[in-house]
């Protein structure tokens, strides 16, 4: 099959059903209020809101608190489309955020933006990776 034929197949309605659409938004959040970063219930609620905002379907959510110097909270939402993972280090006023979705209907950028806006870091980095099969 020529390159042109492959592109025609991928862009056809049938071809779109045959390929995987992967959108991965991830980043680092700096200088966040430490109290928010240690509030497991707040962070879990925040991730649940992000799931809804991004039009994802929740399968399960788990949250854990960790003590010690490098302690914080981890919240993982397993969604039908993939996942949202938020990890915090309260003593460092730092968090990492990972939003990965498969399919055309979900919007990982809106989930990422919602969490960033709620945590209100003084600065953050956001990265995007296209993880589609074609």
Curated annotation (Swiss-Prot):
> Where does this protein come from, organism-wise?
Saccharolobus solfataricus (strain ATCC 35092 / DSM 1617 / JCM 11322 / P2)
Protein name in UniProt: Arginine decarboxylase proenzyme
Other observations noted:
A chimeric protein containing the beta subunit of SSO0536 and the alpha subunit of SSO0585 (SpeH) has ArgDC activity and no AdoMetDC activity, implicating residues responsible for substrate specificity in the beta subunit. But additional factors in the alpha subunit are required for efficient cleavage and turnover.
Recorded effect of pH on activity: Optimum pH is 6.
Q: Which UniProt keywords apply?
A: Autocatalytic cleavage, Decarboxylase, Lyase, Polyamine biosynthesis, Pyruvate, Schiff base, Zymogen
Write out the similarity annotation: Belongs to the prokaryotic AdoMetDC family. Type 1 subfamily.
InterPro entries to which the protein is assigned, alphabetical: AdoMetDC_fam_prok, ArgDC, S-AdoMet_deCO2ase_core, S-AdoMet_deCOase_pro-enz
EC number(s) of the enzyme? 4.1.1.19
Q: How does it assemble?
A: Heterooctamer of four alpha and four beta chains arranged as a tetramer of alpha/beta heterodimers.
Q: Temperature profile of activity?
A: Optimum temperature is 80 degrees Celsius. Highly thermostable. Retains 80% activity after incubation at 90 degrees Celsius for 10 minutes.
